[in-house]
């Protein structure tokens, strides 16, 4: 019996060691990456349009991002609003840019929703265009509320409770191991709603983003 318990502890220690090494490798890899976007750049652009009708703000933001980063923002024919069910909440997102280490998307809810933020190997920032964003951080007993023009930062490994009021819309930028975020983003769709058409739309949007980045890398911005 003692031998069996010892083996279990040995396996647990080995798994922890592997996880620690993997985490270190990942962060070293991220340190070598050349990023297309910057957190503050996205936040500043979004703040310019905060308080406007969200559809007008989004259309102007897309035009500006394409001007600043040609070849890195999906064309109009590839833009699609897709439902997202994750952590108990429901919203919608429109992916503008995606790679293995970055993404930019539009996100929000027309009805309001709340749930778990998820815990990621990525840093995610949301700059609010309209509505309200309530956040309750792990380890605290009070929530914070954010308004149009403010940016909410979700650090790697952090978890919070989130709540968005009706007609809350924002611009989101993520940097880190982006494929690792898909597990949380898709779990409710696979195991709860079983909305496999939405699953297809989500994966297709990410594939389109990766394809655009590969095309731009291989053939340049005018490809």
Swiss-Prot record:
Check the record and name the InterPro entries matching this protein. ERG2_sigma1_rcpt-like
Q: What is the recorded membrane topology of this protein?
A: Single-pass membrane protein
Q: Name one GO molecular function term.
A: signaling receptor activity
Q: Which UniProt keywords apply?
A: Cell junction, Cell membrane, Cell projection, Cytoplasmic vesicle, Endoplasmic reticulum, Lipid droplet, Lipid transport, Membrane, Nucleus, Postsynaptic cell membrane, Receptor, Synapse, Transmembrane, Transmembrane helix, Transport
Where is the region Important for ligand-binding? 99-106
Keyword Cell membrane listed? The answer is yes
On whether Disulfide bond is a keyword of this UniProt record, the answer is no
For this record, the Gene Ontology CC terms, alphabetical, are: anchoring junction; cytoplasmic vesicle; endoplasmic reticulum; endoplasmic reticulum membrane; growth cone; lipid droplet; membrane; nuclear inner membrane
Q: Which GO terms describe its biological process?
A: lipid transport; protein homotrimerization; regulation of neuron apoptotic process
- Region annotation Targeting to endoplasmic reticulum-associated lipid droplets: where it falls in the sequence: 2-8
- Indicate the annotated site residue(s) for Important for ligand binding: 126, 172
Residue ranges in the Cytoplasmic topological domain are 31-223
Topological domains on the Lumenal side lie at 1-9
Compartments (UniProt record):
Nucleus inner membrane; Nucleus outer membrane; Nucleus envelope; Cytoplasmic vesicle
Instruction: Return the annotated region ranges for C-terminal hydrophobic region.
Output: 177-223
Give the stretches traversing the membrane. Answer: 10-30
Q: Which family does it belong to?
A: Belongs to the ERG2 family.
Q: What is known of its domains?
A: The C-terminal helices form a flat, hydrophobic surface that is probably tightly associated with the cytosolic surface of the endoplasmic reticulum membrane.
User: What is the role of the protein in this entry?
Assistant: Functions in lipid transport from the endoplasmic reticulum and is involved in a wide array of cellular functions probably through regulation of the biogenesis of lipid microdomains at the plasma membrane. Involved in the regulation of different receptors it plays a role in BDNF signaling and EGF signaling. Also regulates ion channels like the potassium channel and could modulate neurotransmitter release. Plays a role in calcium signaling through modulation together with ANK2 of the ITP3R-dependent calcium efflux at the endoplasmic reticulum.
Q: Add the further remark from the entry.
A: Sigma receptors are classified into two subtypes (Sigma-1 and Sigma-2) based on their different pharmacological profile.
Q: Cite the record's note on assembly.
A: Homotrimer. Forms a ternary complex with ANK2 and ITPR3. The complex is disrupted by agonists. Interacts with KCNA4. Interacts with KCNA2; cocaine consumption leads to increased interaction. Interacts with RNF112 in an oxidative stress-regulated manner.
Q: What is this protein called?
A: Sigma non-opioid intracellular receptor 1
Q: What is the lineage of its organism?
A: Eukaryota, Metazoa, Chordata, Craniata, Vertebrata
């Amino acid at each position: 019996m003692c031998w069996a318990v010892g083996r279990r502890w040995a396996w647990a220690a080995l798994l922890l060691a592997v996880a620690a090494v993997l985490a270190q490798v990942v962060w070293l890899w991220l340190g070598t990456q050349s990023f297309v976007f910057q957190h503050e750049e996205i936040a500043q652009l979004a703040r310019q349009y905060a308080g406007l009708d969200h559809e007008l703000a989004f259309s102007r933001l897309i035009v500006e991002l394409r001007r600043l980063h040609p070849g890195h923002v999906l064309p109009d024919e590839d833009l699609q609003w897709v439902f997202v069910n994750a952590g108990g909440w429901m919203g919608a997102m429109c992916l503008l840019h995606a790679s293995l280490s970055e993404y930019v998307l539009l996100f929000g809810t027309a009805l309001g929703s709340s749930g778990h933020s998820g815990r990621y190997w990525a840093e995610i920032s949301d700059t609010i265009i309209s509505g309200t964003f309530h956040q309750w951080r792990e380890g605290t007993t009070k929530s914070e509320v954010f308004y149009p023009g403010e940016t909410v930062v979700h650090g790697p490994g952090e978890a919070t409770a989130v709540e968005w009021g009706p007609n809350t819309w924002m611009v989101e930028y993520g940097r880190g191991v982006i494929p690792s975020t898909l597990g949380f983003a898709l779990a409710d769709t696979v195991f709860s709603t079983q909305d496999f058409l939405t699953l297809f739309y989500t994966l297709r949007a990410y594939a389109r983003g990766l394809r655009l980045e590969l095309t731009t890398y291989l053939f340049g911005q005018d490809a």
